[in-house]
Design a protein with these regions (language model features):
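Active-site-adjacent helix/loop patches that line small-molecule binding or acyl-intermediate pockets
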Residues: 16-21, 35-80, 85-112, 156-159
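Short, glycine/proline-biased beta-turn/loop segments that scaffold the active-site neighborhood
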Residues: 1-44, 118-132
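Poly-acidic low-complexity segments
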Residues: 4, 11, 65-67, 146
Length: 186
């Protein structure tokens, strides 16, 4: 979602309000009151800080401003199937039905400077004597995302590890980590 926002002209310094949101479904009458994990609200927040802290209200407002349809189209350009993304604001909080492999492939686009690499599970097969039976061709690198956007998202995801919700990963002793935490029931 944040990559979509950057591609649409937002910056990591753009400010979005982290404040309570309440939606009532006009058909069912069900009320939705999403929360931040901390149960706190922080007011006007830069996107970099929001991503680092995993602030749900900013993320929902960002999706609302960009438009769910535009976001789903962007995800399709990144290689995801559009039918995995429900056309609702809860998609901002992770309501998409993607597999761990699909999610890892999506994040690899950032690690590869905006290029998508189609994953393969089997690199090669050898018989018991070491004779090669099968070897996967080198994966193609498909330009998918503006390298500038990729760099900025990677930088923000590194902040999430260094200073944000993913800081426990620093115990691995590596300085090249980037990541995003978060789960939802919304």
């Amino acid at each position: 979602l944040y990559a979509t926002a950057l591609a649409e002209g937002y910056t990591l310094a753009s400010v979005v309000n982290d404040a309570p949101i309440v939606y009532t479904d006009p058909v069912t009458g069900v009320t939705w009151r999403p929360q931040n994990d901390s149960k706190k609200f922080y007011g006007p927040t830069r996107l970099r800080v929001s991503l680092t802290r995993s602030q749900n209200m900013v993320t929902i407002r960002l999706l609302q401003a960009i438009g769910v349809k535009k976001f789903i189209n962007f995800m399709e350009q990144l290689g995801f199937s559009r039918d995995k993304f429900p056309p609702y604001l809860s998609t901002a909080l992770g309501a998409a039905q993607v597999t761990p492999l699909e999610m890892a492939s999506g994040y690899c686009i950032f690690a590869n400077g905006g290029n998508r690499v189609i994953p393969h599970l089997i690199k090669k097969i050898q018989d018991y004597q070491g004779n090669l039976i099968y070897e996967a061709p080198p994966p193609a690198s498909i330009p998918t995302l503006n390298p500038h956007v990729s760099f900025l998202i990677t930088s923000a995801l590194q902040d999430a590890i260094q200073n944000g919700t993913g800081r426990r990963a620093k115990s691995l002793g590596r300085n090249d980590l980037a990541g995003k935490t978060g789960t939802t029931n919304d």
